[in-house]
């Protein structure tokens, strides 16, 4: 059914996908559900869910190896790495070396056909190079992000450990489903925990 969520609403909320920041840009206004008394902006999970469906269909059209997912943010590094393993996409967790997409002399030079950015602000170098080579940009965007040059925005908490794991897990499942590699979403047996950055307590 078109009006069903990709995962139960409670799962989105438990992962904190809806939790924004205390800053809001004009660009993100359409994705904001409400503002809490403490000044925290809350994202509209229905719109997150809708955009994940669109992104899954869009990304499924690309050759898996021509997709690049990046995350400088610590909590996004395990999710993009696992996303790459599951979908066949290229992943760059951690520091993005300048020239990776623009300078053939760089050791791991790679020119993707589409890029997934975990946070346009933190991943500014990858964003800049994607703009330079003119490829579509799919970005996870929080309440304080700008949408300039973003072709497909997925509104979400793009800093939280559980939120990032869930978003990349859903995206991986949607891509496989839309490619026809699984015939139903229930066939996707990889637990969401495998996408989650583990916290090592000393």
From Swiss-Prot:
Superkingdom: Archaea
Q: Which residues form a coiled coil?
A: none
The entry's keywords: Ribonucleoprotein, Ribosomal protein
Signal sequence range: none
Gene Ontology biological process terms in this record: translation
Give any GO molecular function from the UniProt entry: structural constituent of ribosome
Family matches, as InterPro entries: Ribosomal_uS2, Ribosomal_uS2_arc, Ribosomal_uS2_CS, Ribosomal_uS2_euk/arc, Ribosomal_uS2_flav_dom_sf
List cellular component terms (GO). small ribosomal subunit
NAD listed as a keyword: no
Keyword Metal-binding listed? The answer is no
Query: TM segments?
Result: none
Q: Which HAMAP family match?
A: Ribosomal_uS2_A
Report the family membership.
Belongs to the universal ribosomal protein uS2 family.
Xref: PANTHER family: 40S RIBOSOMAL PROTEIN SA
Q: What is this protein called?
A: Small ribosomal subunit protein uS2
Q: Which gene encodes it?
A: rps2
């Amino acid at each position: 059914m078109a009006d069903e969520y990709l995962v139960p609403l409670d799962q989105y909320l438990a992962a904190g996908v809806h939790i924004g920041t205390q800053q809001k840009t004009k660009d993100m206004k359409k994705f904001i559900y409400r503002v809490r008394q403490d000044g925290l902006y809350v994202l509209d999970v229905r719109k997150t869910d809708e955009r994940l469906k669109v992104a899954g269909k869009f990304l499924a059209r690309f050759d898996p190896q021509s997709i690049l997912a990046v995350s400088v943010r610590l909590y996004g590094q395990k999710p993009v790495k696992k996303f790459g393993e599951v979908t066949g996409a290229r992943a760059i967790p951690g520091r993005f070396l300048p020239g990776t997409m623009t300078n053939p002399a760089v050791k791991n030079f790679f020119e993707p056909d589409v890029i997934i950015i975990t946070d346009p602000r933190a991943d500014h170098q990858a964003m800049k190079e994607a703009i330079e080579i003119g490829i579509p940009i799919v970005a996870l965007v929080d309440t304080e992000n700008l949408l300039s040059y973003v072709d497909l925005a997925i509104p979400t908490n793009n800093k939280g450990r559980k939120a990032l794991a869930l978003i990349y897990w859903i995206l991986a499942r949607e891509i496989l489903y839309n490619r026809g590699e699984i015939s139903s979403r229930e066939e996707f047996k990889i637990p969401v925990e495998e996408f989650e950055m583990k916290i090592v307590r000393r």
